[in-house]
Design a protein with these regions (language model features):
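N-terminal leader/targeting and accessory segments in enzymes
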Residues: 1-90, 94
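Walker A (P-loop) phosphate-binding motif
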Residues: 93-103
Length: 103
């Protein structure tokens, strides 16, 4: 199975391709759990809005952050979408179709 990479994410989310492709280690939604090579999805919850932590996540080595708040869209390595939760669901569906699991 081909590993997940930034090009796949951008293609699935109908975003411009990054200037450099890279293999994605993990998809993460908790900013406290970020590691180098991860892609962070900034989800807004009832108590916290993960967009408040995007700059920290990128500083910790995230490959990219998928964001839906305008003030985060200009950050380096930010992938701007209309709705980060919907983008995560779209990516999950695209990955499942790519893997073609036997159920």
């Amino acid at each position: 199975m081909k590993p997940l990479d930034l090009n796949f994410i951008c293609q699935a989310l109908h975003l411009p391709m990054p200037s450099e492709n890279a293999e994605v280690q993990r998809i993460v939604t908790d900013s406290r759990d970020i590691q180098s090579g991860d892609v962070f999805f900034a989800l807004a919850g009832e108590r916290f809005d993960a967009h408040d932590f995007v700059a920290d996540v990128l500083a910790k080595g995230a490959l990219a952050a998928v964001v839906s708040r305008e003030d985060c869209a200009a950050l380096p390595r930010a992938l701007s979408v209309a709705d980060a939760l919907q983008a995560l669901q779209t990516l999950a569906q695209a990955w499942r179709e790519n893997v073609n699991p036997f159920v």
